[in-house]
């Protein structure tokens, strides 16, 4: 299996195919139509930004506003407003695609750290070529962003537990905090879905400590 994976990544034709797929993802983001709830999420980002920039003076009421405070949608709206009105939908899709691609690379790094580089490369290929994920990369500003937050929080949590340097640990803490705020803004129960991950790493951390103590004796 490792030889096959190395062959895939060292094969120029396969690498060219991956590059083409990246460009195809961008192409799809530009030409694809509007998702059924995209305009609502963009409006949510607009309302939140107006509220923040006006220091609470502009307080628009929209449906489910009390359930969402998505920093991601606010950030996306800020980027979208840099483009002409006729191209704001495409800009929204490109922002979503960018974070979806970061999700793929995040999974590669996480799988590489948990197992080895070959498994990381394989996870990269599987997720990239997975039709359901690829189809949602541009138009879904909820599930793909939740996946982005999940994967990178898990990766930084793993690095936090393994790193003994206090400065490095603090760096991981604020990154995890930012990602957690992104996730909870989209889905309130986001942190609850991380409980299995936290339990797994706690057991891993305790087991590693016990193993090191036994070695010292």
Regions found by a protein language model. Give the residues of each.
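Specific aromatic-rich, kink-prone transmembrane helix
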Residues: 106, 110, 146-165, 179
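Perimembrane helix-loop-helix junctions
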Residues: 1-4, 159-166, 193-217
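Loop-to-helix entry region of an early transmembrane alpha helix in multi-pass inner-membrane enzymes
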Residues: 66, 70, 74, 84-102, ...
């Amino acid at each position: 299996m490792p030889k096959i994976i190395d062959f895939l990544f060292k094969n120029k034709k396969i690498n060219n195919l991956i590059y083409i797929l990246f460009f195809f993802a961008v192409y799809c983001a530009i030409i694809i139509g509007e998702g059924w709830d995209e305009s609502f999420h963009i409006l949510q980002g607009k309302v939140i930004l107006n509220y923040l920039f006006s220091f609470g003076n502009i307080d628009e009421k929209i449906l489910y506003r009390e359930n969402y405070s998505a920093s991601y949608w606010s950030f996306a709206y800020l980027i979208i407003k840099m483009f002409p009105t006729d191209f704001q939908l495409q800009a929204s899709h490109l922002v979503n695609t960018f974070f979806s691609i970061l999700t793929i690379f995040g999974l590669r790094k996480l799988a590489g750290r948990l197992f080895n580089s070959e498994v990381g490369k394989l996870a990269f290929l599987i997720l990239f070529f997975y039709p359901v994920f690829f189809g949602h990369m541009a138009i879904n500003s909820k599930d793909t962003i939740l996946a982005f937050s999940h994967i990178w929080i898990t990766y930084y949590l793993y690095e936090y537990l393994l790193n003994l340097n206090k400065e490095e640990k603090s760096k991981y803490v604020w990154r995890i905090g930012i990602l957690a705020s992104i996730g909870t803004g989209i889905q309130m129960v986001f942190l609850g879905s991380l409980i299995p991950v936290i339990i797994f790493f706690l057991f891993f951390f305790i087991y590693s400590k016990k193993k090191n103590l036994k070695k010292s004796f």
